[in-house]
Amino acid sequence: MDHKNPLVSWNVFGFDLVFNLASIMMLVITAIIVFLIAIICTRNLKKRPSGKQNFIEWIFDFVRSIIESNMAWKKGGQFHFLAVTLILFIFVANMLGLPFAIVTKDHYLWWKSPTADATVTLTLSTMMILLTHYYGVKMRGTKAYIGNYFKPFWPLAIINVFEEFSSTLTLGLRLYGNIFAGELLLSLLAGLVVSSAWGWIIGIPGLIVWQGFSIFVGSIQAYIFIMLSMVYMSHKVADTH
């Protein structure tokens, strides 16, 4: 069954801006969950961590290892909180659409993973790529940063600029494609369960297996997004490109 997105459009200076209300709602929910995780896991910190403090410290150590695998900690340390926030945000966003979906009588899909929306993932990737440019200019200087696009000879500038656009697209669309495909198959399996009396024989085992696989894929995609983001960042802030 085809689902529709709850869209609203605003006319601004003659241009129609279309917003997906479901994606906005799910992004807010994701942000709230990440905020609560941060608050709960960092309350009453102790020198000897246990339980939830162990979890958040493991996340920080894991992300630090990603950063250190791409650049010196002296430069990469300032991106630590950014990367931790991103990996938690993307992981939670990837997981939200797995347990269930909420669809109204009019077939409007309200509850889903926000990362199953290409607009969301491309916005995340665009923001990340723009941040790499910002820190590249800030840490290396405008002249050195722009001049690097023309090395070792100026015709490469065209290829380097094209690479920036392709990096943005691949970073965002990779995340979107994997999460969207996972939720699509889950909806098909759920439809198989309710479509016939015998559908549950295949549908329920398939749902269980695919749910587990989707958790794995969602986790891997969060890791890949952060890893590639730090790779791109290291290329921009390093003294050599």
Swiss-Prot record:
One of its GO terms (biological process) is proton motive force-driven plasma membrane ATP synthesis. Signal peptide: none annotated. It is found in: Cell membrane. It is a multi-pass membrane protein. Keywords: ATP synthesis, Cell membrane, CF(0), Hydrogen ion transport, Ion transport, Membrane, Transmembrane, Transmembrane helix, Transport. It comes from the Bacteria. One of its GO terms (molecular function) is proton-transporting ATP synthase activity, rotational mechanism. GO terms for cellular component: plasma membrane; proton-transporting ATP synthase complex. Its main location: membrane. The chain crosses the membrane at residues 21-41, 83-103, 117-137, 175-195, 218-238. SUPFAM superfamilies: F1F0 ATP synthase subunit A. It holds the Pfam family ATP-synt_A. Key component of the proton channel; it plays a direct role in the translocation of protons across the membrane. F-type ATPases have 2 components, CF(1) - the catalytic core - and CF(0) - the membrane proton channel. CF(1) has five subunits: alpha(3), beta(3), gamma(1), delta(1), epsilon(1). CF(0) has three main subunits: a(1), b(2) and c(9-12). The alpha and beta chains form an alternating ring which encloses part of the gamma chain. CF(1) is attached to CF(0) by a central stalk formed by the gamma and epsilon chains, while a peripheral stalk is formed by the delta and b chains. NCBIfam families: ATP_synt_6_or_A, PRK05815.1-4. HAMAP family: ATP_synth_a_bact (MF_01393). Belongs to the ATPase A chain family. This is ATP synthase subunit a.
